[in-house]
Each structure stands twice: as C-alpha cells, then as structure tokens.
Amino acid sequence: MASSSSNRQFSHRNANTFLTYPKCPENPEIACQMIWELVVRWIPKYILCAREAHKDGSLHLHALLQTEKPVRISDSRFFDINGFHPNIQSAKSVNRVRDYILKEPLAVFERGTFIPRKSPFLGKSDSEVKEKKPSKDEIMRDIISHSTSKEEYLSMIQKELPFDWSTKLQYFEYSANKLFPEIQEEFTNPHPPSSPDLLCNESINDWLQPNIFQVSPEAYMLLQPACYTLDDAISDLQWMDSVSSHQMKDQESRASTSSAQQEQENLLGPEA
C-alpha cells in the first residue's frame, strides 16, 4: 500500500497561524524570513520561531504567524521550507500558543510586534478574561480542514480531544480511513507485453511435463495393485502410450472431410 492521501480540499483561513515543523533543524531566523516572504500579500505583522529538541534528541521548529489580513490557502504545501512540511493550525489563542512555543526553546527569533488577543468589549487580555472554549464540532471542523494525512488527523485529535481519542479511537480510525483512503498500488504485469514472450513456453512446459503428461512407474504401481514390479509398470506404460498414440492418429484421419484424403473414387455424375 502506498502512503495515504485524500482528494479532500485542504483549507486554512486565519490571521493567526500556528506552524509545527517536525524533525526540522532549520535555523529559526532563516525560517522566519522565509515564512515572512511567503505571506507578504497578507501583510505580516509578527512572527515567532523557536527550535526545540525531542526526547530522542531530534529537533523541531514551532512558529506563530500574525497577519493583518487572514491567510487564505488551499495548498497544504504552501508553508513548506527547504523540503520540510509543517502541521498547519489556526492559533485560537495567540497568547497560549506563544507561551507554548517559548516554554523550552533552544533558539528563538522574532520579527514584528506581537498582537495579544483582546476582548472586544472589555479590552482585556486572555489572562484577564476567560476565553470561550470551542465546541467539539468546531475543533473537529478545524482538524478536518487542516489535516493532510491519516497520521496527522489522528495525532491532532489525540492532542485536542484526548478523552474522546482514548475512548472512541475505533470511530476516529474509521473516519480517518474514509478521509484518507489507501492508494492502491498500480498493477505491474510481470510478463513482457510482446506476444511471443508472453506465452512463456519454457515456464509452461516445465510445469506441464511433470504435472500433466508424465506418469511415473512408481505412481502407476500404486494405482494398479496387480502390477508387482517396476519393469511391469514400465512395460504397461509404454504399451498405453503406443496404443493411445495410434488411436489419436486414427481419429485425426477419420475426422478429415476431404475425399482425396479418404482415397475415395470421384464418381461421374449422371449425363444430361
């Protein structure tokens, strides 16, 4: 089976974007500049990149991007940098995402001015106002629109809905198989396409001789209790081969409709 994929349309639309590049050793400053240039049309205002280390020592990169206009993309490869593909998510709480990125960084780079989320009525930050928690429908809608593979889809559910993931994993696996069906490998004919070679006479004969046409004396003795010696079995088989060969020749000669082959006299028809 090939790696899973889907013809489902990827979609991301948000002014706050959270990117995670797994197993990416890229320098945060270089990554920031490359991502900044990708979103110039949406007027970037702030970007933060941080390099972190996994427990196994491999490096990964987190990035928080804020733009004046919502980034609108339908290409899941839009944010790829130097061959590294990120997980793309909407940053629902920029303050929390920023705190998460800065928890244990090995290297950090920022550009622009961070825009903390404010309450539209009270003008207070996230730390002062309790944010409205997104519903499960909203979370799943965001996961479906942003995931690009079966593994990424299940990983995002495990992160966002850990209890549901642990108790309803079989249902999520079912939906993952529907969203990202396995691509069937194209059949490759092991035989060459040309007619003479396609017959594979050598291979067929190698199978026919021992399985169809050949009867060993030993096998014949097992089927004929009255045959006691190997010589008798060989003699019987030779006799049967001779008789059957003559019978086949006789049948071929009788099957002909040619009067010349049957050596019949051509009689003259009645005179007019």
Swiss-Prot record:
Cofactor section: Mg(2+); Mn(2+)
Biased composition annotated in UniProt, kind: Polar residues: 254-265
Enzyme Commission numbers on file: 3.1.21.-
Gene Ontology cellular component terms for the protein in this record: host cell cytoplasm; host cell nucleus
InterPro entries tied to this protein: CRESS_DNA_REP (IPR049912), Gemini_AL1_MSV (IPR001146), Gemini_AL1_REP (IPR001191), Gemini_AL1_REP_central (IPR022692)
Membrane-spanning segments: none
Stretches for region Oligomerization: 175-187
Residues reported to bind a divalent metal cation: 52, 60, 62, 104
RCR-2, short sequence motif: residues: 60-62
UniProt GO molecular function: DNA binding; endodeoxyribonuclease activity, producing 5'-phosphomonoesters; metal ion binding; nucleotide binding; nucleotidyltransferase activity; structural molecule activity
Role according to the record: Implicated in enhancement of V-sense gene expression. Acts a an inhibitor of C-sense gene transcription.
Name of the protein in its database record: Replication-associated protein A
Originating organism: Maize streak virus genotype A (isolate Kenya)
